[in-house]
Amino acid sequence: MSKLYVGSEVGQLRRVLLNRPERALTHLTPSNCHELLFDDVLLVEAAGKEHDAFADTLRQQGVEVLLLHDLMVDTLAVPEAKQWLLDVQISDFRYGPIFARDLRRYLSEMDNEHLATILLGGLAYSELPIQSASMLPRMKQPLDFVIEPLPNHLFTRDTSCWVYGGVSLNPMMKPARQRETNHLRAIYQWHPIFAGQDFIKYFGNEDLHYDNANIEGGDVLVIGKGAVLIGMSERTTPQGVENLAANLFKHGQAKEVIAIELPKHRSCMHLDTVMTHMDVDTFSVYPEIMRKDLHTWRLTPKGNGEMQVEALHNYLHAIERALGLNHLNIITTGGDSYEAEREQWNDANNVLTVKPGVVIGYERNVYTNEKYDKAGIEVLTIPGNELGRGRGGARCMSCPIERDDI
Protein backbone atom coordinates (compact mmCIF):
# COMPACT_ATOMS: atom_id res chain seq x y z
CA MET A 1 0.00 0.00 0.00
CA SER A 2 1.32 3.45 -0.90
CA LYS A 3 2.16 5.73 2.00
CA LEU A 4 0.07 8.35 0.21
CA TYR A 5 -3.17 6.89 1.50
CA VAL A 6 -6.04 8.03 3.71
CA GLY A 7 -8.23 5.12 4.75
CA SER A 8 -10.52 6.77 7.28
CA GLU A 9 -11.29 9.83 9.39
CA VAL A 10 -10.30 8.21 12.68
CA GLY A 11 -7.42 5.81 12.06
CA GLN A 12 -3.96 6.81 13.25
CA LEU A 13 -2.98 10.06 11.54
CA ARG A 14 0.59 9.82 10.27
CA ARG A 15 1.24 12.73 7.92
CA VAL A 16 -0.59 16.01 7.39
CA LEU A 17 -0.29 19.23 5.38
CA LEU A 18 -0.69 22.59 7.17
CA ASN A 19 -0.15 26.21 6.17
CA ARG A 20 1.12 28.63 8.80
CA PRO A 21 -0.68 32.02 8.64
CA GLU A 22 1.75 34.65 7.42
CA ARG A 23 1.89 37.24 4.61
CA ALA A 24 -1.55 36.57 3.10
CA LEU A 25 -3.28 37.51 6.34
CA THR A 26 -1.34 40.79 6.57
CA HIS A 27 -3.12 41.83 3.37
CA LEU A 28 -6.56 41.36 4.96
CA THR A 29 -8.32 44.63 5.79
CA PRO A 30 -11.85 45.51 6.91
CA SER A 31 -12.54 46.73 3.37
CA ASN A 32 -11.39 43.58 1.55
CA CYS A 33 -11.87 40.75 4.06
CA HIS A 34 -15.37 39.81 2.90
CA GLU A 35 -14.25 39.63 -0.73
CA LEU A 36 -11.47 37.32 0.47
CA LEU A 37 -14.05 35.20 2.38
CA PHE A 38 -13.11 36.26 5.90
CA ASP A 39 -15.51 37.79 8.41
CA ASP A 40 -12.81 39.72 10.24
CA VAL A 41 -9.13 40.64 10.23
CA LEU A 42 -6.80 38.59 12.42
CA LEU A 43 -3.80 39.49 14.55
CA VAL A 44 -1.30 37.72 12.33
CA GLU A 45 1.51 37.22 14.85
CA ALA A 46 -0.91 35.82 17.44
CA ALA A 47 -2.55 33.57 14.84
CA GLY A 48 0.89 32.27 13.87
CA LYS A 49 1.69 31.37 17.48
CA GLU A 50 -1.65 29.59 17.84
CA HIS A 51 -0.94 27.67 14.65
CA ASP A 52 2.49 26.71 15.95
CA ALA A 53 0.77 25.25 19.02
CA PHE A 54 -1.50 23.25 16.71
CA ALA A 55 1.46 21.91 14.73
CA ASP A 56 3.36 21.07 17.92
CA THR A 57 0.35 19.17 19.29
CA LEU A 58 0.28 17.08 16.13
CA ARG A 59 4.01 16.37 16.36
CA GLN A 60 3.62 15.32 20.00
CA GLN A 61 1.12 12.73 18.76
CA GLY A 62 3.70 11.34 16.34
CA VAL A 63 2.26 13.03 13.25
CA GLU A 64 4.64 14.29 10.56
CA VAL A 65 3.74 17.89 9.72
CA LEU A 66 4.38 19.24 6.22
CA LEU A 67 4.10 23.01 5.71
CA LEU A 68 2.73 24.40 2.46
CA HIS A 69 5.27 27.21 2.13
CA ASP A 70 8.16 24.75 2.45
CA LEU A 71 6.62 22.44 -0.16
CA MET A 72 6.15 25.40 -2.50
CA VAL A 73 9.81 26.43 -2.16
CA ASP A 74 10.96 22.90 -2.95
CA THR A 75 8.55 22.63 -5.89
CA LEU A 76 9.69 25.94 -7.40
CA ALA A 77 13.23 24.54 -7.41
CA VAL A 78 12.06 22.24 -10.22
CA PRO A 79 12.35 24.38 -13.39
CA GLU A 80 9.38 22.75 -15.11
CA ALA A 81 7.17 23.36 -12.07
CA LYS A 82 8.25 27.00 -11.78
CA GLN A 83 7.58 27.61 -15.47
CA TRP A 84 4.15 25.95 -15.29
CA LEU A 85 3.07 27.92 -12.23
CA LEU A 86 4.12 31.23 -13.77
CA ASP A 87 2.46 30.40 -17.09
CA VAL A 88 -0.83 29.34 -15.52
CA GLN A 89 -1.03 32.17 -12.99
CA ILE A 90 0.50 35.05 -14.97
CA SER A 91 -1.37 34.57 -18.22
CA ASP A 92 -1.83 36.99 -21.12
CA PHE A 93 -5.58 36.78 -20.59
CA ARG A 94 -5.33 37.82 -16.95
CA TYR A 95 -2.81 40.64 -17.36
CA GLY A 96 -2.55 41.42 -21.07
CA PRO A 97 0.48 40.30 -23.13
CA ILE A 98 2.72 43.26 -22.27
CA PHE A 99 2.29 43.28 -18.50
CA ALA A 100 2.20 39.47 -18.29
CA ARG A 101 5.58 39.29 -20.02
CA ASP A 102 7.12 41.89 -17.71
CA LEU A 103 5.61 40.35 -14.59
CA ARG A 104 6.71 36.81 -15.49
CA ARG A 105 10.24 38.06 -16.07
CA TYR A 106 10.31 39.83 -12.71
CA LEU A 107 8.93 36.84 -10.81
CA SER A 108 11.14 34.29 -12.59
CA GLU A 109 14.25 36.14 -11.40
CA MET A 110 13.21 35.92 -7.72
CA ASP A 111 14.70 33.34 -5.42
CA ASN A 112 12.28 30.50 -4.73
CA GLU A 113 11.69 31.46 -1.09
CA HIS A 114 10.56 34.96 -2.07
CA LEU A 115 8.49 33.72 -5.01
CA ALA A 116 6.65 31.20 -2.83
CA THR A 117 5.87 34.01 -0.37
CA ILE A 118 4.46 36.19 -3.16
CA LEU A 119 2.38 33.42 -4.78
CA LEU A 120 0.83 32.48 -1.44
CA GLY A 121 0.72 35.91 0.18
CA GLY A 122 -0.01 38.29 -2.68
CA LEU A 123 1.58 41.43 -4.13
CA ALA A 124 0.21 44.98 -4.30
CA TYR A 125 1.06 47.44 -7.07
CA SER A 126 2.76 49.62 -4.46
CA GLU A 127 5.12 46.69 -3.76
CA LEU A 128 6.01 46.16 -7.44
CA PRO A 129 9.40 47.70 -8.31
CA ILE A 130 9.22 47.28 -12.09
CA GLN A 131 7.85 49.59 -14.78
CA SER A 132 5.76 48.35 -17.70
CA ALA A 133 4.51 49.94 -20.92
CA SER A 134 1.18 48.19 -20.41
CA MET A 135 -1.95 50.24 -19.78
CA LEU A 136 -3.10 47.95 -16.96
CA PRO A 137 -0.75 49.00 -14.12
CA ARG A 138 -1.27 52.67 -14.98
CA MET A 139 -4.98 52.28 -14.33
CA LYS A 140 -4.55 50.64 -10.92
CA GLN A 141 -4.35 52.14 -7.46
CA PRO A 142 -1.27 51.50 -5.27
CA LEU A 143 -3.17 49.19 -2.90
CA ASP A 144 -4.78 47.16 -5.68
CA PHE A 145 -3.37 43.66 -5.94
CA VAL A 146 -1.17 42.53 -8.81
CA ILE A 147 -1.39 39.04 -7.33
CA GLU A 148 -4.26 38.50 -4.91
CA PRO A 149 -3.35 37.08 -1.50
CA LEU A 150 -4.65 33.63 -0.64
CA PRO A 151 -5.49 33.81 3.09
CA ASN A 152 -7.82 30.81 2.77
CA HIS A 153 -4.80 28.62 2.05
CA LEU A 154 -4.81 28.40 5.86
CA PHE A 155 -7.58 25.85 5.37
CA THR A 156 -5.57 23.16 3.60
CA ARG A 157 -8.46 20.70 3.98
CA ASP A 158 -10.44 22.23 1.13
CA THR A 159 -8.07 22.59 -1.80
CA SER A 160 -7.24 18.91 -2.08
CA CYS A 161 -8.47 15.84 -0.26
CA TRP A 162 -6.96 12.38 -0.11
CA VAL A 163 -9.52 9.62 -0.43
CA TYR A 164 -8.19 6.10 0.01
CA GLY A 165 -5.46 5.60 -2.63
CA GLY A 166 -5.70 8.93 -4.41
CA VAL A 167 -6.35 12.64 -4.27
CA SER A 168 -8.97 15.04 -5.58
CA LEU A 169 -7.58 18.42 -6.67
CA ASN A 170 -10.70 20.35 -5.99
CA PRO A 171 -12.27 22.92 -8.33
CA MET A 172 -13.16 25.57 -5.76
CA MET A 173 -16.47 27.43 -5.76
CA LYS A 174 -15.28 30.97 -4.98
CA PRO A 175 -12.90 32.97 -7.24
CA ALA A 176 -10.91 34.04 -4.15
CA ARG A 177 -9.80 30.41 -3.72
CA GLN A 178 -9.52 29.03 -7.23
CA ARG A 179 -5.79 29.76 -7.64
CA GLU A 180 -5.04 27.62 -4.59
CA THR A 181 -5.60 24.41 -6.52
CA ASN A 182 -2.80 25.23 -8.98
CA HIS A 183 -0.30 25.23 -6.12
CA LEU A 184 -1.38 21.76 -5.02
CA ARG A 185 -1.37 20.52 -8.61
CA ALA A 186 2.26 21.60 -8.92
CA ILE A 187 3.26 20.14 -5.55
CA TYR A 188 1.67 16.76 -6.24
CA GLN A 189 3.22 16.65 -9.71
CA TRP A 190 6.79 17.79 -9.03
CA HIS A 191 7.65 17.84 -5.32
CA PRO A 192 10.07 14.99 -4.43
CA ILE A 193 7.67 13.58 -1.81
CA PHE A 194 5.01 13.01 -4.49
CA ALA A 195 6.79 12.84 -7.86
CA GLY A 196 6.86 9.30 -9.19
CA GLN A 197 4.71 7.94 -6.35
CA ASP A 198 1.86 5.54 -7.00
CA PHE A 199 -1.36 7.43 -6.35
CA ILE A 200 -4.44 8.38 -8.35
CA LYS A 201 -5.52 11.91 -9.24
CA TYR A 202 -9.27 11.47 -9.31
CA PHE A 203 -10.51 14.87 -10.31
CA GLY A 204 -9.46 18.45 -10.97
CA ASN A 205 -5.99 17.87 -12.42
CA GLU A 206 -6.84 18.89 -15.98
CA ASP A 207 -6.51 22.33 -17.56
CA LEU A 208 -10.26 22.70 -17.80
CA HIS A 209 -12.97 25.07 -16.67
CA TYR A 210 -15.06 22.86 -14.41
CA ASP A 211 -18.19 25.01 -14.71
CA ASN A 212 -20.50 24.00 -11.85
CA ALA A 213 -18.64 20.84 -10.83
CA ASN A 214 -17.31 22.28 -7.57
CA ILE A 215 -16.16 20.30 -4.58
CA GLU A 216 -14.22 21.28 -1.45
CA GLY A 217 -12.46 18.98 0.98
CA GLY A 218 -14.32 20.27 4.03
CA ASP A 219 -17.37 18.53 2.63
CA VAL A 220 -15.62 15.16 2.14
CA LEU A 221 -15.41 12.64 5.00
CA VAL A 222 -13.58 9.37 4.32
CA ILE A 223 -15.55 7.37 6.86
CA GLY A 224 -13.81 4.08 6.00
CA LYS A 225 -14.67 0.59 4.74
CA GLY A 226 -14.89 1.92 1.19
CA ALA A 227 -17.50 4.57 2.03
CA VAL A 228 -17.26 8.33 1.53
CA LEU A 229 -19.65 10.87 3.07
CA ILE A 230 -20.01 14.16 1.16
CA GLY A 231 -21.99 17.24 2.08
CA MET A 232 -23.58 19.36 -0.63
CA SER A 233 -23.07 22.75 0.98
CA GLU A 234 -22.81 26.25 -0.42
CA ARG A 235 -19.37 25.25 -1.76
CA THR A 236 -19.95 21.70 -3.10
CA THR A 237 -22.43 20.92 -5.87
CA PRO A 238 -24.21 17.73 -6.98
CA GLN A 239 -22.19 17.94 -10.21
CA GLY A 240 -18.96 17.93 -8.22
CA VAL A 241 -20.10 15.01 -6.08
CA GLU A 242 -21.13 12.91 -9.08
CA ASN A 243 -17.85 13.59 -10.90
CA LEU A 244 -15.75 12.63 -7.89
CA ALA A 245 -17.90 9.56 -7.22
CA ALA A 246 -17.60 8.42 -10.84
CA ASN A 247 -13.81 8.59 -10.64
CA LEU A 248 -13.67 6.84 -7.27
CA PHE A 249 -15.74 4.01 -8.71
CA LYS A 250 -13.75 3.95 -11.96
CA HIS A 251 -10.55 3.31 -10.02
CA GLY A 252 -12.15 0.86 -7.58
CA GLN A 253 -11.37 3.11 -4.61
CA ALA A 254 -14.85 3.37 -3.08
CA LYS A 255 -17.89 1.13 -2.73
CA GLU A 256 -20.39 3.90 -2.05
CA VAL A 257 -20.76 7.65 -1.69
CA ILE A 258 -23.40 9.04 0.69
CA ALA A 259 -24.37 12.60 -0.29
CA ILE A 260 -26.25 14.93 2.08
CA GLU A 261 -27.86 18.22 1.09
CA LEU A 262 -26.88 20.79 3.72
CA PRO A 263 -28.49 24.11 4.65
CA LYS A 264 -26.97 26.89 2.54
CA HIS A 265 -25.68 29.44 5.02
CA ARG A 266 -22.37 30.68 6.40
CA SER A 267 -22.36 28.70 9.64
CA CYS A 268 -22.87 25.50 7.64
CA MET A 269 -20.24 26.29 5.05
CA HIS A 270 -18.93 22.72 4.85
CA LEU A 271 -20.03 19.38 6.25
CA ASP A 272 -17.12 19.37 8.70
CA THR A 273 -18.34 22.60 10.31
CA VAL A 274 -21.38 20.70 11.58
CA MET A 275 -20.24 17.07 11.69
CA THR A 276 -16.97 15.21 12.25
CA HIS A 277 -15.98 11.58 12.86
CA MET A 278 -14.29 11.11 16.26
CA ASP A 279 -14.15 7.37 16.86
CA VAL A 280 -15.18 4.30 14.90
CA ASP A 281 -18.81 4.65 16.01
CA THR A 282 -18.83 8.25 17.26
CA PHE A 283 -19.67 11.50 15.47
CA SER A 284 -19.91 15.09 16.62
CA VAL A 285 -23.05 16.67 15.13
CA TYR A 286 -24.61 20.13 15.33
CA PRO A 287 -28.31 19.57 16.17
CA GLU A 288 -29.54 21.53 13.14
CA ILE A 289 -28.48 18.72 10.81
CA MET A 290 -30.09 16.00 12.93
CA ARG A 291 -33.30 16.68 11.02
CA LYS A 292 -34.61 13.62 9.23
CA ASP A 293 -35.80 15.66 6.24
CA LEU A 294 -32.31 16.41 4.92
CA HIS A 295 -32.20 15.08 1.36
CA THR A 296 -29.75 12.19 1.20
CA TRP A 297 -28.63 9.93 -1.65
CA ARG A 298 -26.50 6.82 -1.92
CA LEU A 299 -24.34 6.51 -5.05
CA THR A 300 -22.95 3.11 -5.99
CA PRO A 301 -21.21 1.73 -9.10
CA LYS A 302 -23.48 -0.05 -11.54
CA GLY A 303 -20.90 -1.27 -14.02
CA ASN A 304 -19.98 0.01 -17.47
CA GLY A 305 -19.01 3.35 -15.95
CA GLU A 306 -22.54 4.05 -14.72
CA MET A 307 -23.80 4.87 -11.23
CA GLN A 308 -26.95 4.04 -9.35
CA VAL A 309 -28.45 6.89 -7.33
CA GLU A 310 -30.79 5.89 -4.51
CA ALA A 311 -32.74 8.38 -2.38
CA LEU A 312 -32.48 7.68 1.35
CA HIS A 313 -34.61 8.77 4.28
CA ASN A 314 -31.98 8.97 7.02
CA TYR A 315 -28.29 9.70 6.50
CA LEU A 316 -27.34 8.41 9.97
CA HIS A 317 -28.81 5.01 9.14
CA ALA A 318 -26.89 5.10 5.86
CA ILE A 319 -23.65 5.66 7.78
CA GLU A 320 -24.47 2.79 10.17
CA ARG A 321 -25.04 0.46 7.23
CA ALA A 322 -21.86 1.56 5.44
CA LEU A 323 -19.74 0.97 8.55
CA GLY A 324 -21.49 -2.24 9.60
CA LEU A 325 -22.66 -0.74 12.90
CA ASN A 326 -25.92 -1.25 14.76
CA HIS A 327 -25.84 2.18 16.36
CA LEU A 328 -23.96 5.48 16.11
CA ASN A 329 -22.89 7.41 19.17
CA ILE A 330 -23.86 11.01 18.42
CA ILE A 331 -22.45 13.85 20.53
CA THR A 332 -24.22 17.14 19.94
CA THR A 333 -22.78 20.61 20.43
CA GLY A 334 -22.63 21.55 24.12
CA GLY A 335 -24.53 24.05 26.24
CA ASP A 336 -28.01 25.49 25.89
CA SER A 337 -29.30 26.64 22.51
CA TYR A 338 -27.44 29.96 22.74
CA GLU A 339 -24.17 28.38 23.83
CA ALA A 340 -24.44 25.63 21.23
CA GLU A 341 -24.90 28.17 18.44
CA ARG A 342 -21.94 30.22 19.69
CA GLU A 343 -19.68 27.18 19.98
CA GLN A 344 -20.67 25.78 16.59
CA TRP A 345 -19.81 29.21 15.13
CA ASN A 346 -16.43 28.86 16.84
CA ASP A 347 -15.83 25.41 15.31
CA ALA A 348 -16.70 23.18 18.26
CA ASN A 349 -17.74 20.47 15.81
CA ASN A 350 -14.70 20.96 13.60
CA VAL A 351 -12.20 18.77 15.42
CA LEU A 352 -9.34 16.76 13.95
CA THR A 353 -9.13 13.13 15.02
CA VAL A 354 -5.52 11.96 15.43
CA LYS A 355 -6.41 8.40 16.46
CA PRO A 356 -9.61 6.68 17.59
CA GLY A 357 -11.17 8.68 20.41
CA VAL A 358 -8.51 11.41 20.49
CA VAL A 359 -9.18 14.77 18.82
CA ILE A 360 -7.71 18.27 18.58
CA GLY A 361 -10.03 21.24 19.08
CA TYR A 362 -10.14 24.83 20.28
CA GLU A 363 -9.95 25.31 24.06
CA ARG A 364 -12.58 28.08 23.92
CA ASN A 365 -15.42 25.60 23.25
CA VAL A 366 -15.74 24.60 26.89
CA TYR A 367 -19.31 23.24 26.87
CA THR A 368 -18.78 21.00 23.86
CA ASN A 369 -15.34 19.85 25.02
CA GLU A 370 -16.91 18.84 28.34
CA LYS A 371 -19.51 16.74 26.50
CA TYR A 372 -16.77 15.07 24.47
CA ASP A 373 -14.86 14.27 27.66
CA LYS A 374 -17.92 12.76 29.34
CA ALA A 375 -18.50 10.60 26.26
CA GLY A 376 -14.97 9.20 26.49
CA ILE A 377 -13.38 11.37 23.80
CA GLU A 378 -10.03 12.89 24.74
CA VAL A 379 -9.74 16.50 23.55
CA LEU A 380 -6.26 17.93 23.04
CA THR A 381 -7.02 21.63 23.26
CA ILE A 382 -5.26 24.39 21.34
CA PRO A 383 -5.66 28.18 21.55
CA GLY A 384 -7.92 29.65 18.90
CA ASN A 385 -8.84 33.21 19.80
CA GLU A 386 -7.36 34.47 16.52
CA LEU A 387 -7.45 31.37 14.32
CA GLY A 388 -11.11 30.85 15.20
CA ARG A 389 -11.98 34.24 13.72
CA GLY A 390 -11.17 32.73 10.33
CA ARG A 391 -14.15 30.37 10.80
CA GLY A 392 -12.18 27.17 10.63
CA GLY A 393 -11.07 24.65 13.25
CA ALA A 394 -8.44 21.93 13.44
CA ARG A 395 -10.02 19.80 10.71
CA CYS A 396 -10.36 22.76 8.34
CA MET A 397 -6.69 23.67 8.85
CA SER A 398 -5.32 20.21 8.04
CA CYS A 399 -5.06 17.99 4.98
CA PRO A 400 -4.26 14.39 5.95
CA ILE A 401 -1.93 12.73 3.46
CA GLU A 402 -1.34 9.49 5.32
CA ARG A 403 -3.85 7.90 7.70
CA ASP A 404 -4.62 4.31 8.66
CA ASP A 405 -7.78 2.35 7.90
CA ILE A 406 -10.24 1.48 10.65
From Swiss-Prot:
GO cellular component: a single term: cytoplasm
Entry annotated with the keyword Cytoplasm: yes
EC primary class: hydrolase
GO BP: any one term: arginine catabolic process to ornithine
Molecular function GO terms recorded: arginine deiminase activity
Cell compartment(s), UniProt: Cytoplasm
Sequence similarity: Belongs to the arginine deiminase family.
Protein name: Arginine deiminase
